[in-house]
């Protein structure tokens, strides 16, 4: 072998480039590639300077908080205005009172509607000039039983029509529409009568709807008895329920329509008080008529 090849060739000497700080005559910008590397081995990002990030966060956070607060205030104001407008048309807060019931109240109230003859205390209890919720007072009117009884009446009517091969959605719809129409007519007639007689009472329209809707409980009992025992069972049960509803309405409405005389302990005398008593009896007496009119065609 050659003697020169036995030795490693000496390393080539690296030629240093020109000083970066000395710019050539034709160079437009300084070459900073040879400058010191920042701590961490990363170069600063010139597109987003570090000094601008805290300032931007400081400015954007108050603006976002202000926008959120302003939006929440607008939403709360809009909700409040909507609730006020709805309450003007439909008193939602008052209607909630009529659905404040429980299972015990529903059972006792249905028993009172079917057997009102042994009940003694018919006065509605008050707490701070406000009637207590129905679940605490069996004498308080409610809408839960009338609404559920109305729906159940429509279902039982459909069952009765089905057993007679007369069921159709159109007939069932007419049945529901006629029952609702008669209820509205009844309530409007009572309101007109109270206005003509000039009765100062705390009865509201919702109270009248509740009292007028209690008769559906007896109507359901009559139709079911007719399906099980024929016309004889229908007439017997419907007659009992009709008399019970008349007794219930007289004892309940007497304290409402004759509230002034009852509060003063005055006997029902004079033309005005007698007219109020006749009105109470008329409202109660019309209940069995509606009960028969809306159910007689369902039993054959």
From Swiss-Prot:
Extracellular side: 164-178, 227, 300
Keywords annotated in UniProt: Endoplasmic reticulum, Golgi apparatus, Membrane, Protein transport, Transmembrane, Transmembrane helix, Transport
Segments of this protein annotated with the region Disordered: 1-46
Keyword Transmembrane included in the entry's annotation: yes
Pfam families registered for this protein in UniProt: YIF1
Topology class, membrane: Multi-pass membrane protein
Record's keyword annotation contains Aminoacyl-tRNA synthetase: no
Example GO biological process: sperm flagellum assembly
Main location: endoplasmic reticulum
Entry's transmembrane regions: 143-163, 179-199, 206-226, 228-248, 279-299
Cytoplasmic side: 1-142, 200-205, 249-278
UniProt subcellular location: Endoplasmic reticulum membrane; Golgi apparatus membrane; Endoplasmic reticulum-Golgi intermediate compartment membrane
Any one of the GO CC terms: endoplasmic reticulum-Golgi intermediate compartment
Protein role: Functions in endoplasmic reticulum to Golgi vesicle-mediated transport and regulates the proper organization of the endoplasmic reticulum and the Golgi. Plays a key role in targeting to neuronal dendrites receptors such as HTR1A. Plays also a role in primary cilium and sperm flagellum assembly probably through protein transport to these compartments.
Family that this chain belongs to: Belongs to the YIF1 family.
Protein name: Protein YIF1B
Organism: Xenopus tropicalis
Gene: yif1b
């Amino acid at each position: 072998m050659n003697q020169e090849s036995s030795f490693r060739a000496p390393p080539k000497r690296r030629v240093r480039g020109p000083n970066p700080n000395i710019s050539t005559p034709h160079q437009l910008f300084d070459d900073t590639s040879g400058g010191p590397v920042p701590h961490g081995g990363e170069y600063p990002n010139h597109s987003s300077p570090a000094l601008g990030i805290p300032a931007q966060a400081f400015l954007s956070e108050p603006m976002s908080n202000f926008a959120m607060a302003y939006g929440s205030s607008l939403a709360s104001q809009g909700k409040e205005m909507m609730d006020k407008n709805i309450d003007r048309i439909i008193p939602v807060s008052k209607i909630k009172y009529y659905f404040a019931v429980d299972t015990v109240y529903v059972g006792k109230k249905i028993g009172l509607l079917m057997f009102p003859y042994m009940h003694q205390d018919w006065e509605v209890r008050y707490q701070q000039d406000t009637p207590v919720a129905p679940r605490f007072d069996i004498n308080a009117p409610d809408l839960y039983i009338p609404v559920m009884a109305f729906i159940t009446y429509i279902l039982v009517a459909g069952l009765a029509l089905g057993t007679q091969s007369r069921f159709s959605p159109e007939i069932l719809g007419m049945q529901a529409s006629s029952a609702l129409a008669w209820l509205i007519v009844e309530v409007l007639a009572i309101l007109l009568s109270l206005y003509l007689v000039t009765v100062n009472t705390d009865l509201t329209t919702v109270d009248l709807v509740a009292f007028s809707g209690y008769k559906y409980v007896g109507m359901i009992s009559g139709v079911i008895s007719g399906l099980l025992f024929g016309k004889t069972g229908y007439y017997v049960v419907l007659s009992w329920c009709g008399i019970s509803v008349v007794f219930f309405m007289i004892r309940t409405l007497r304290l409402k329509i004759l509230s002034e005389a009852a509060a003063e302990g005055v006997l029902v005398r004079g033309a005005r008080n007698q007219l109020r008593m006749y009105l109470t009896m008329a409202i109660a007496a019309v209940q069995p008529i509606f009960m028969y009119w809306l159910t007689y065609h369902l039993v054959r």
